[in-house]
Amino acid sequence: MKTAVAFDFASGDSPENINVNPDRSLTVSLLGVPANKPPKLVQITPSGQRSTLVNGHLGDQITGNTRGSDGTVYYNVDSDGTARNGVWKLPPHGRPERLAALPDGLPNGIAIDPAGRTLYAADSYNSTVWAVPTSGGQAKIWLNGPALAADPHGSLPLGVNGVRFHKGAVWLSNYSQGKLLRIPVTAHGTPGPIHTVADNIPDFDDFAFLNNHSDIVFAAQNDPTDRVTVVRPNGTTQVALTTGDGLASPTTTAISGDKLYIADAGFKAPHDAKLQRATINLHARTGHPRHH
């Protein structure tokens, strides 16, 4: 386990989400709010060089981000300002613009379908996944209900959080219910039945798949659980990384080849905000990261 990038929590650089680009660079959402600073969307090259893509507004949060095949970056903004809350896009060499407004809530994880036509945005306060056309237009409720709601007894009142489109289905994490859900997408684009893959993952923030063909998931479990857990397709889980490996409020994971990236938001003192990198042993049946 290595620190790939060290962040300065006091300047607002608290990483929330990671997307791996084809050139192996990373697009990283930095929250800002925990240190009362504006949020940012940054790109980090494999050599660690950093450039700022978007400077947000003080009080807003940039949460999930994803990428279209043409290089457009799509990201969620959580804002008290109705003119900014919602799903945004940043075209290559363009300027950021809001694609769709969302009602008051907490826009969080975001995913794009393989055809590049539809974005799926989680709303952690409103128990909802919104569908947003990449061509623009009004956000529509794709799925909502109790499976996406928060557990009132959880450490935080957050429901649906992470979103991935994988093998013809939308996969979701429910933060306070501690569940991994799989919802097939029908030929008409509507949600099929909700399948609970695993239900024992407390403080389940976001996740990544081992690769495009595997259903093995690396789940990031935020405070106070503070671990990365491997979830197998049959729902069994195994802890892979803990605070002993340097985890500090892990918010998400991302995978590039045999490299596992973990975003550590550093919410708790000493606020050790960073990106960590581990090597996955792809030949091991556990799919565990190697500790080095």
Where are these regions (language model features)?
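Blade-level signature of beta-propeller repeat domains, shared across WD40, Kelch, NHL, RCC1
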Residues: 252-292
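A short loop-to-beta-strand structural motif that recurs across blades of beta-propeller domains
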Residues: 39-42, 85-88, 128-131, 179-181, ...
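Beta-rich, blade/repeat-based domains predominating
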Residues: 10-25, 29-30, 37-38, 56-84, ...
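Short loop/turn segments immediately following the C-termini of beta-strands
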Residues: 31-33, 78-80, 124-125, 134, ...
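Short loop/turn segments that connect beta-strands within beta-propeller blades
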Residues: 44-49, 90-95, 133-137, 184-189, ...
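Hydrophobic alpha-helical segments and helix pairs
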Residues: 86-142
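Glycine/small-residue-rich hydrophobic helix-like segments
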Residues: 178-248
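A short beta-strand motif characteristic of beta-propeller blades
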Residues: 2-9, 49-56, 95-101, 138-154, ...
